[in-house]
Amino acid sequence: MSKVEKKKLLIYAHYYIPDTASTGQILRELAEGMLDKFDVTVICVVPSYLGTVEDEYKTQRFYRESINGVKILRIRVPEFSKTNTVSRIKNILTYFFGAMIATFKVGKQDYVFSISQPPILGGLLGVWGKWMKHAKYIYNIQDFNPEQVLAVNFSKNKLITGAMMFFDKFSCRRSDLIITVGRDLVQTVHNRFKGKKVPKTVMINNWIDENEIYPVETNHPKVAAFKEKYGLQDKFVIMYSGNIGLYYDLENIMKVIEQVKPGTKTADGREVVFAFVGAGSVLDKLVVYKEEKHMNNVVFIPYQDKADLIYSLNAGDVHWCVNAKGIKGVSCPSKYYGIAAAGKAVLAVLEKDSEIRCIIEETHGGLCSEPGDYEAIAENLKWFIENAGTDKVDEMGKRSRENLVQNLTRDVSVKKYAEEILKL
């Protein structure tokens, strides 16, 4: 008997490997993890996450590739600067219209899958794919817009935010299934459609590959080399790892950190150091603040290659997991998964009932406080400094890792995605 032909799945990814965008990583693992059930094609940009494009991707409009069994159609986009809004918009619109054209180059598709990136446009691409391919449409919402824009007062223009809401609700209504990544995000879908028919929605947690990020001894040569390079050896390292951007209230967190004076020691005699690993739109402001206030106990470290992430995460003793007020129900801090995978305690600043705070409280994986409650944040910080090196802190990290291995692995979540899509 001939082998049953696999159903065809088209993914609009925006970014895809080798780009390091977190959504690109998740979609790679999702696409590769579902190859046993689907014939997968990805439409995405040429590698360009940091703004530059290699010469090999500058000559054609489209590039066909295959990575680990996934078919890829890449769209050439212009280079951009993260600080230049016009170049950014031009870059995103080139992808959007390029992806619409690319849709005609991938043949018949049974399912179309799109994420909420770029904001609003990702959802609309999925609707376009559904119509052009007469396919079932799955809308994967990683973060809600305009809710995210409104939460941080990025735009108060009611015309713009109203149009964004109109179009994204349109994408939700046209979908056959919405998959989102937290209990609080499911609630947001319900809030959007109060009193009206709510589109079919399920929640599937994001994940991390637990075999790629895991606890490593502090004296591991690569962890030791990382610590030495950035002056962290023999220190108690409170780390923030990830995007240093708008949605994390980091400028105010710096004011809390300032209360811990350089030279402060933990109960077990180590000097306390705050390490920020990453980059983003707020980084320069934090650097200026550090210099002005002579905060010699704060270090800024550039993004690490994905292969080295395990060592940088393990160099932290405690990790910040923070969101600004208003982000509950809007997005889910994916950095939590890396912290839990490395088996580290969490210093969380997250709203009550947000997905990640629920997980941290359910597993007793760290200490939580509300965004904006700087006294409580300072108290929790003080607790970690006073309890450094004790079993209490170690056990928090161990519990987080155990829960992750049982419930938040790639295999568990990818299996759920495949099951939900095939039910349609």
Regions found by a protein language model. Give the residues of each.
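Carbohydrate-associated surface elements
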Residues: 46, 184, 204-207
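A short helix/loop element that forms part of the nucleotide-sugar donor recognition site in Leloir-type
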Residues: 58-63, 214-231
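Nucleotide-sugar-dependent
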Residues: 248, 298, 305-311, 319-340, ...
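A short, well-ordered alpha-helix in the C-terminal region of glycosyltransferases
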Residues: 392-407
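Nucleotide-activated donor-binding/catalytic signature segment of Leloir-type glycosyltransferases, i.e.
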Residues: 264, 269-271, 277-278, 283-308
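N-terminal subdomain of nucleotide-sugar transferases
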Residues: 1-68, 260, 264, 411
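Conserved donor-binding/catalytic core segment of Leloir-type glycosyltransferases
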Residues: 232-248, 254-258
